[in-house]
Amino acid sequence: MNVRKPVDYGTMYLELTAILAQNLPQMGEIHAIGKAVSQRPEKGAAVAAAEFLQANFPDRTGFSPRNVRRMRDFYRTYENDQTRLRLALKIGWTLNVVIMEAELTSVQRIACLQRAAAERLSKKKLLEIILNDAFAEKPIDEPDEIC
């Protein structure tokens, strides 16, 4: 039986409240929430964050445990890659989830991020592109020759 161990998430809850008070753009808020959850070593941090956000911000949506885990994964995916993070912040959450959950190479991920931002793709169109391998194998701005 799974029994929760007593953990003090007070600091994380304060941080989450401060993030939501800033009225950040959607992707900035998602990145910040993901960072706050990612900094906690406990396995149940995402679930605790989701429960806190749902209880304290009932007018806000999108804070299911699954979605908060995705926010944590989003932060971890781009925490050491500011170039890709800037691209990811230009598109919406739904498209970012599609790209994160697809099994793409680093180059393919960049190409998808660039194309999604440049062409303002729908989720359906992005899924078609990924499923049909219909994106460039190299990023749009990458030169043909590298010295």
Residue ranges with predicted function:
Residues 1-147:
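Basic, low-complexity intrinsically disordered segments
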